[in-house]
Design a protein with these regions (language model features):
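Long, contiguous binding/interaction regions
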Residues: 2-41, 53-79
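A short acidic, helix-capping loop that chelates divalent metal ions and anchors anionic groups
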Residues: 45
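Helix N-cap motif at beta-to-alpha junctions
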Residues: 48-51
Length: 79
């Protein structure tokens, strides 16, 4: 199994990386670029066949290690 994880800044949190990318795109002549949000994408290979156990394990890893729950949201899917 594989977990695909997306971690993004919370909507209420300032995203300086996203703002920098947004400004750079505007300076490069890309019109109409709105807000840009920069996050993280991870793929984790998982052993075993118990999807519910894998879901619990990834949720715990995201909450305790992979994301900062104060300033980031995460979502994932198990394939």
């Amino acid at each position: 199994m594989k977990a695909k994880i997306i971690i993004t800044p919370k909507k209420a949190v300032l995203d300086p990386q996203g703002k920098t990318v947004q400004n750079a795109l505007a300076q490069m002549g890309y019109p109409g670029v709105g807000a840009v949000h920069v996050g993280k994408y991870l793929e984790i290979e998982l052993a075993g066949a118990d999807r519910e156990a894998a879901r619990r394990q990834i949720d715990e890893a995201c909450h305790k290690l992979l994301s900062n729950p104060v300033i980031e949201d995460y979502r994932f899917e198990i394939e």
